[in-house]
Amino acid sequence: MALLDFFLSRKKNTANIAKERLQIIVAERRRSDAEPHYLPQLRKDILEVICKYVQIDPEMVTVQLEQKDGDISILELNVTLPEAEELK
């Protein structure tokens, strides 16, 4: 009987399979979502503020928004500042 139970317990019911597939689809959608509509304007505004104090190339500023599990969003801002000698 134990051998029969072993083989029968390995089968997954269709609800669990469907749940796993749906979780995969949701995770893929979260990763592939387009950036929010406000992100380009946010990048532009941040660049304008930085340019008030330091002359930089607009390509030296990157803004990324990363979605984590649940309702957590991480805004990553990378700015490459010129050398101190170039500021004078």
UniProtKB/Swiss-Prot annotation:
NCBIfam families noted in UniProt: minE (TIGR01215), PRK00296.1 (NF001422)
Domain of life the protein comes from: Bacteria
Protein name, UniProt field: Cell division topological specificity factor
Organism: Escherichia coli (strain K12)
Function: Prevents the cell division inhibition by proteins MinC and MinD at internal division sites while permitting inhibition at polar sites. This ensures cell division at the proper site by restricting the formation of a division septum at the midpoint of the long axis of the cell.
Keywords: Cell cycle, Cell division
UniProt GO MF annotations: ATPase activator activity; identical protein binding
Gene3D superfamilies: Cell division topological specificity factor MinE
Gene giving rise to this polypeptide: minE
Gene Ontology biological process terms in this record: division septum site selection; regulation of division septum assembly
GO cellular component terms listed in the entry, alphabetical order: cytosol; plasma membrane
Family per record: Belongs to the MinE family.
Phenotype of gene-disrupted mutants: In a minCDE operon disruption (minC-minD-minE), cells divide not only at midpoint but also at their poles, yielding small minicells and long rods. Loss of polar localization of several polar-localized proteins including GroEL-GroES, TnaA and YqjD.
